[in-house]
């Protein structure tokens, strides 16, 4: 991902220009940046005029780029196993797409890479269902086709542990 920093930056800036993301200059801990969990307080940077935000970027002020989740309403996505799933947008956080060091978050890189590689089906564990609405909103913001999601139950090594490549399963 570090070798493709320019690619991810280009797409993140495109979302800012289209109003689907914003520059955030707030000082949050790295864990808060990565998780998007910071008390769900409204981000004061969310509604900064683009010209003001761009001037701060141009002046060298550190920033992240956050996804601008629509306020109110719902987002529905389809899963091949679970069917249609609808979530309230108010339950979704404005996740970080591009970190202060210019590297993308895993979730943002996934969407960009899957699109650029022509991925049509995304198969993953059901524990990742909660990420799908944000992915959908990103695909829609770019005007890209949304892949077919297939969220499966985890395959278990034993009664307590999922199979894992890390453990040689």
Map each language-model feature to its residues.
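Aromatic/His-enriched, Gly/Pro-containing loop or helix-boundary segments
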Residues: 1-11
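Active-site cores that bind ATP or allylic diphosphates and position pyrophosphate for catalysis
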Residues: 14-169
């Amino acid at each position: 991902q570090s070798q493709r920093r320019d690619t991810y930056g280009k797409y993140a800036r495109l979302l800012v220009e289209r109003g689907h993301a914003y520059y955030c200059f707030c000082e949050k801990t790295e864990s808060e940046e990565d998780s998007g969990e910071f008390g769900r307080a409204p981000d004061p940077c969310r509604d900064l005029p683009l010209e003001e935000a761009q001037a701060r970027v141009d002046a060298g002020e550190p920033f992240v780029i956050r996804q601008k989740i629509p306020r109110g309403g719902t987002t529905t996505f389809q899963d091949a196993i679970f069917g249609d799933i609808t979530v309230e947008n108010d339950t979704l956080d404005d996740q970080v797409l591009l970190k202060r060091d210019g590297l993308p978050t895993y979730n943002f890189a996934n969407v960009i890479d899957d699109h650029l590689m022509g991925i049509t089906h995304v198969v993953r564990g059901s524990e990742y269902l909660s990420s799908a609405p944000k992915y959908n909103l990103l695909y829609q913001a770019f005007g890209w086709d949304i892949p077919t999601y297939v969220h499966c139950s985890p395959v278990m090594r034993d009664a307590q542990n999922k199979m894992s490549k890390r453990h040689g399963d």
